Amino acid sequence: MRKYEMLSILDAGTENQSEEIAKIEDVIKNLGGTVSKSDAWGKKTLAYPIRKKTEGFYVLFSFELEPSQTSELRRILGLRAYVYRQLMTVVDE
């Protein structure tokens, strides 16, 4: 397994952000990964509108996942309406 960090921008208009964060953690766990940390950065103004919204809720996830599962994670999160964007990077040890 490899270590990854993923910065996600979620819908800031949703009432329960912790529920959305838990759903993303569940997706990672269902793909065989382990989440070591999820750090909510809070609501921030976007540099440009995304889906006609000007604010997003930023969350940084640290997790381990098999490299073969990263494309599936991107696909699943891309289908979620509450996930505006995500950027996943490999953490060098």
Where are these regions (language model features)?
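Long, contiguous binding/interaction regions
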Residues: M1-F57, E64-E93
